[in-house]
Amino acid sequence: MTSAGRAWLAGRATGEDTRSIAQVGIGSDGTEPTESDTALVSEIARTAATVSSSSDVVDITASFNLAQEYTVREVGVFLDDGTLIGRWVLADTLIGAGEPLDVTVEFRVSDGGVY
């Protein structure tokens, strides 16, 4: 999770931040994520997210259908104002033109943090 993501989560917990998770993005760069990330390194596409939650788990899902072939290496979750709250690196995932790609990101919230 990014620093901005942790700040957003703290603000949501106190009711001071009303922004919502809105989009999932995918990209082609495999550079390790950092807390200071503000964007995907090499964004391919971004689409609307579906968010569901139960007690301590938040599931974020999105579906992509790309017009050309890409190797997907990174995934990011964005708020409705475009703020990146988390970025993750994947094993190389080759997606052919017209092939669907479904992405799910799961946040687990516990006393020890967000995972």
Tell me what each language-model feature is:
Residues M1-R73, D80-Y115:
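Small cysteine-rich, disulfide-bonded extracellular modules of the LU/uPAR three-finger superfamily
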